[in-house]
A protein has these predicted regions:
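Amphipathic alpha-helical interface elements
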Residues: 1-55, 68-74, 92-100
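Histidine-centered active-site/metal-ligand motif
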Residues: 64-65
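Structured adenosyl-cofactor binding patch, chiefly the S-adenosyl-L-methionine
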Residues: 80-93
């Protein structure tokens, strides 16, 4: 999940001090987030912002602040798939946010 945070910072042009769920809310702000797809319906934009922020709060934040046991290999694989999909979304935004 740290890779997602780093990618969002990089692609969105955020500072190192921008972290976690708050960073995701800024990056995917429904009205002016640099990684927000403004062609999507408002509810979908909000849902994507919630997905990114929720992922940070649920997975990255927990791992950052305490030892979280992850003993189930299926669950670990599912979390990796989620992270991979979120990275795909971020990197798809890279060309839209690049300066001409």
């Amino acid at each position: 999940m740290r890779a997602i945070e780093i990618a969002v910072r990089d692609v969105g042009g955020f500072a190192a001090r921008d972290v976690g769920a708050a960073l995701m809310r800024k990056a995917f702000d429904v009205d002016n987030g640099p990684l927000t797809d403004m062609t999507a319906e408002r509810g979908e934009r909000q849902a994507l912002s919630d997905l990114f922020a929720g992922t940070m709060g649920t997975y990255k934040n927990a791992q950052s602040h305490r030892k979280v046991g992850l003993d189930d290999p299926d669950e670990a694989a599912e979390i990796l798939m989620l992270a991979s999909h979120l990275l795909r979304i971020v990197y798809a935004r890279r060309s839209r946010t690049a300066a001409p």
